[in-house]
Structure formats: structure tokens, C-alpha cells
A protein has these predicted regions:
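Conserved class I S-adenosyl-L-methionine
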Residues: 25-33
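Class I SAM-dependent methyltransferase SAM/SAH-binding core
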Residues: 34-36, 40-80
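Short conserved loop adjoining the S-adenosyl-L-methionine
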Residues: 80-87
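A conserved beta-strand element that flanks and buttresses the S-adenosyl-L-methionine
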Residues: 94
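A short, conserved alpha-helix within the catalytic core of class I
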Residues: 102-111
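Conserved beta-strand signature within the Rossmann-like core of class I S-adenosyl-L-methionine
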Residues: 118-125
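C-terminal alpha-helical "lid/dimerization" subdomain adjacent to the S-adenosyl-L-methionine
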Residues: 127-175
Length: 204
């Protein structure tokens, strides 16, 4: 596979990197896969760490980043109890097409623990179609997305572990309202949603 490619997740990389650049500092990419987003974050962050549980993906990400000293790829599970003590907190925490692989509410709580004061959590996620409205919106997007995919020469299979989402967007909103009540969630193009949450500045 080419080092650079496009798909429905990569479509969000530019805005994620632009957002991270406003804070600089350090970035954590949870479920970093082959390291493409992590590599792009190194252009705007002094330190970039990727977490991935798939050993083959970790090997690919490390090859991609072998000449990037400020990047580190860890074969690790974000839900491990001692992870926050081991890796610390980050100005930007990203989680692209990964949250639906994890237990939703515990994962939201854990991701928030990894965000530094004044930092931001950025989730790009997939939601299950459960309501009539969900199905209608997905159906309306089919043709436009095929056109966009053809224009970008979409790469559908990048050789990483995938699974279908379990929770609907309504269920994700409800969970976020309990765990991260200030989170901003929006349905997006590309069968995705975004969740953004800012940790307040620490008051002395």
C-alpha cells in the first residue's frame, strides 16, 4: 500500500491536524493503526504517541515513523488500568474509528483522563443505524460518497482490524451526556460523527 491514501477516516485528518496545531505540545492517537494520522501530527506537535493493540499495525506504524524522533508507537491498550500513570496527559487526544471497538462509557472516561488541562479530545466515530432517520440519512449519502470516493481514489481496505459499530448516535449522545456533559457531538459526512471535549484549564 502507498504511504499516503484516502478513505472516510483520512478525510478528517486535515481538520484534526489544523486543530492540534493551535495547541502544539503533545498528541496521543488512540488506535493509531498504520500511523498515518500520527505522522501528520508530528508536523505540528513536539511529541506524538500512538497506541495500538494490533501487532501488525504497530509494526507498520513504526516503519512509517522510523525517521521521526518525536514519534513513538506503543503496543498497548488504552483501557489498561495503569496507562495514565505510564504515559501522562496530552494537549491533543485523537481517537479515529476506534471508539466503537471499546466499551463506550468506560472508554470516554479513560480518554478524558488522558487530556491535559486546556487540552482537547477529538473523536471521529462510527455509529450504528437504528432509527428510521439514521437509515434515511445513510441512504441519502450513498451516491455522493461514491462520487467523492472515486474522485479521491478511495482505499477501502488498509489492512487493519475493523468491526461494525454497536451504538447509535442517539446512544452515543446519551452516554457522552453522562460522562462528558460538555462534549460537542455532530453528525458528519462519510458516515461519521465527531465528538470534541475540552478539559478546563487547571485553576490554582
Amino acid at each position: 500500500m502507498a504511504d499516503d491514501y484516502w478513505n472516510h477516516n483520512v478525510a478528517f485528518h486535515r481538520r484534526i491536524v489544523r486543530d492540534a496545531a493551535r495547541r502544539g505540545g503533545s498528541a496521543l492517537d488512540v488506535g493509531c493503526g498504520d500511523g498515518l494520522l500520527l505522522a501528520r501530527l508530528t508536523a505540528v506537535c513536539r511529541r506524538a504517541v500512538g497506541l495500538e493493540t494490533d501487532g501488525q499495525a504497530v509494526a507498520r506504524a513504526r516503519r512509517r515513523l522510523e525517521r521521526t524522533p518525536q514519534a513513538e508507537v506503543l503496543l498497548d491498550d488504552v483501557m489498561d488500568l495503569d496507562l495514565p500513570q505510564r504515559i501522562g496527559t496530552f494537549e491533543t487526544v485523537t481517537c479515529v474509528a476506534t471508539l466503537h471497538h471499546l466499551p463506550l462509557e468506560p472508554a470516554l472516561a479513560r480518554l478524558s483522563e488522558l487530556v491535559a488541562p486546556s487540552g482537547r479530545l477529538i473523536v471521529v466515530g462510527l455509529a450504528a443505524n437504528k432509527s428510521l432517520w439514521d437509515w434515511m440519512l445513510s441512504a441519502l449519502a450513498v451516491l455522493p460518497l461514491r462520487v467523492v470516493g472515486a474522485l479521491h481514489r478511495e482505499t477501502r481496505d488498509i489492512g487493519v482490524v475493523t468491526r461494525p459499530p454497536r451504538e447509535s448516535l442517539a446512544e452515543i449522545r446519551a452516554a457522552a451526556s453522562r460522562i462528558l456533559p460538555e462534549a460537542r457531538i455532530r453528525r458528519r459526512f462519510y458516515y461519521r460523527y465527531t465528538l470534541m471535549w475540552d478539559r478546563p484549564m487547571k485553576v490554582l
